[in-house]
Amino acid sequence: MMKGQLAGLMRQAQQMQENMKKAQDALAEIQVEGAAGGGLVKVTMTCRHDVKRVAIDPSLLGEDKDMLEDLVAAAFNDALRKAEATSQEKMASVTAGMPLPPGMKLPF
């Protein structure tokens, strides 16, 4: 490989790294909401999987503990799926054109 090509490749890699960092920082700010029980339990988290809020409708507080635990878990899992889908969408623009192996997800 010629010296000029190598320098260009290094610049491209550095730019990609900067874009990846910006995208990851943006994901830390994006919030998604998962819900269960028809919206009676809601979990809000960032796309970096930091839970920001858990909201439980007061009508559930006197209910069966096991059911409430199941609804919280379901709402959390719903939020997690939404966060992952949003992250993949955002990272797709950063990784567009990169020859990544099938099934490889970024960020690592």
UniProtKB/Swiss-Prot annotation:
Residues covered by region (Disordered): 86-108
Record's subcellular location: Cytoplasm, Nucleoid
Major location (coarse): cytoplasm
Matching InterPro entries: YbaB-like_sf, YbaB/EbfC
Molecular function as annotated in GO: DNA binding
Keyword Cytoplasm found: yes
Functional note: Binds to DNA and alters its conformation. May be involved in regulation of gene expression, nucleoid organization and DNA protection.
PANTHER family found in the cross-reference section: NUCLEOID-ASSOCIATED PROTEIN YBAB (PTHR33449:SF1)
HAMAP family, per the entry: DNA_YbaB_EbfC
Official protein name in the record: Nucleoid-associated protein BPP1222
UniProt source species: Bordetella parapertussis (strain 12822 / ATCC BAA-587 / NCTC 13253)
Lineage: Bacteria, Pseudomonadati, Pseudomonadota, Betaproteobacteria, Burkholderiales
